[in-house]
């Protein structure tokens, strides 16, 4: 019913965006919205690479702004995600984007705080519970060394030192206090 009042229901994915009020909702309401979005348009899958298994959650849309809105909502719940442009899709003429949650802690947080109605299976929960999700991911730093010195510039704009980048509060490297 809410989707109808906000003129979201019945729109194509490329035309959808979230009303500003969503970003003021309680965590519980945001979790319910994300749950239903991922239940309808999202996926959860087990990716197998060698002996390791990892879980991937995702949602896709040709609307990059919408993907960034979803990413911001996930960030507020402590769930990290990445947006990728999908290229060379035979059926898709325009640009297409996938938002993916793959980091084990973010996947676990998503499943426990938000869930995907009707899509989470016991096998997904077992992989997370056993701590074997995404075991071989990442890189191991063996050595840090200086290769060359580069110039770095800091540009400050008075009274605008703090700002949001991809939904996270950040600041320039000046002397501002967050």
What are the functions of these language-model segments?
Residues 1-178:
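Internal intein/HINT superfamily modules and their associated LAGLIDADG
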């Amino acid at each position: 019913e809410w989707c109808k009042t906000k003129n979201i229901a019945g729109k194509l994915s490329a035309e959808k965006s979230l009303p500003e009020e969503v970003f003021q909702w309680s965590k519980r309401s945001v979790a319910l919205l994300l749950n239903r979005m991922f239940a309808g348009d999202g996926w959860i899958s087990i990716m197998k690479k060698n002996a390791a298994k990892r879980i991937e959650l995702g949602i896709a849309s040709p609307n990059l702004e919408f993907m960034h809105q979803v990413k911001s909502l996930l960030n507020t719940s402590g769930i990290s995600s990445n947006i990728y442009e999908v290229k060379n899709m035979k059926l898709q003429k325009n640009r297409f984007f996938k938002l993916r949650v793959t980091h084990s802690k973010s996947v676990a947080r998503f499943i426990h705080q938000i869930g995907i109605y009707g899509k989470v299976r016991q096998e997904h929960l077992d992989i997370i519970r056993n701590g074997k999700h995404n075991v071989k991911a990442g890189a191991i730093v063996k050595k840090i060394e200086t290769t060359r010195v580069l110039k770095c510039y800091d540009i400050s704009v008075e009274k605008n030192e703090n700002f949001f980048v991809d939904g996270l509060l950040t600041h320039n490297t000046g002397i501002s206090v967050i």
